[in-house]
Curated annotation (Swiss-Prot):
This is Sulfate adenylyltransferase subunit 2. Belongs to the PAPS reductase family. CysD subfamily. Heterodimer composed of CysD, the smaller subunit, and CysN. HAMAP family: Sulf_adenylyltr_sub2 (MF_00064). With CysN forms the ATP sulfurylase (ATPS) that catalyzes the adenylation of sulfate producing adenosine 5'-phosphosulfate (APS) and diphosphate, the first enzymatic step in sulfur assimilation pathway. APS synthesis involves the formation of a high-energy phosphoric-sulfuric acid anhydride bond driven by GTP hydrolysis by CysN coupled to ATP hydrolysis by CysD. The keyword Chaperone does not apply. The gene is cysD. Its EC number is 2.7.7.4. The keyword Nucleotide-binding applies. Pathway: Sulfur metabolism; hydrogen sulfide biosynthesis; sulfite from sulfate: step 1/3. Coiled coil: none annotated. One of its GO terms (biological process) is sulfate assimilation.
Amino acid sequence: MFMTESRLTHLKQLEAESIHIIREVAAEFENPVMLYSIGKDSAVMLHLALKAFYPAKLPFPLLHVDTGWKFKDMIAFRDNMAKTHGFDLIVHQNKEGREAGINPFDHGSSKYTDIMKTQALKQALDKYQFDAAFGGARRDEEKSRAKERVYSFRDSKHRWDPKNQRPELWNLYNGKVNKGESIRVFPLSNWTELDIWQYIYLENIQIVPLYFSAVRPVVERSGTLIMVDDERMRLKEGEVPQMKSVRFRTLGCYPLTGAVESEADTLPEIIQEMLLATSSERQGRMIDHDEAGSMEKKKQEGYF
């Protein structure tokens, strides 16, 4: 007897939908890749992909765009996951940007993000000629992502046109692309932040320790707590790091990622926090505060 969709829990329905999308892409495209940002959404997406093809290995590689400014714990976690699961991991960095010394302090978050993230991603997609790329974005994160399709068409310059999106009826997706064009695929589109945390708890998925509360050195800038992760952190005159009990709801480059004061050091406690949260997790992403509509503008330029 087959289990109908109506008999599945909402998390199992989301899981089934995501696995269907991942398998569809693997079957439909010649050279797909999974973007691996090392965050909680990437952890769930990787877990779903491993489930989708178990006991076989993943039929596509993982790509991490390394800006050089990720948290140390993130890089250690990435390398450990690759070793544990044996997947093919591609690490790409914008060599020209690195040699030019592009950093979030001297060049600002907008220019830094464009060069070390957007341009680096486009370089990697062109270099390896990927025709589809999985990403862990969700529609509840931010308004420009809310209107993006599961299969997000990108032209030969990796640009997204929000006014020219393909219809998606039921679970049917149009993956037709010409040479040089590509599709960004978002299997977690219909998940919420709370869904992600509940699934991590139920499936016992490994995540970066930074998501759990611990006493860490931070400085407060414009109301945002920035963790001092290494000696490259530039302190302003008179600024002294304070030890506070904090955790992160979202992860990125450490000088541009805000922590939240919290005592939640277990998954049930994090889930309880999510039930009471009144702001988006991306409030902690300083790159989203550059200008009005900045995320949509970044996506039109090729950002994920």
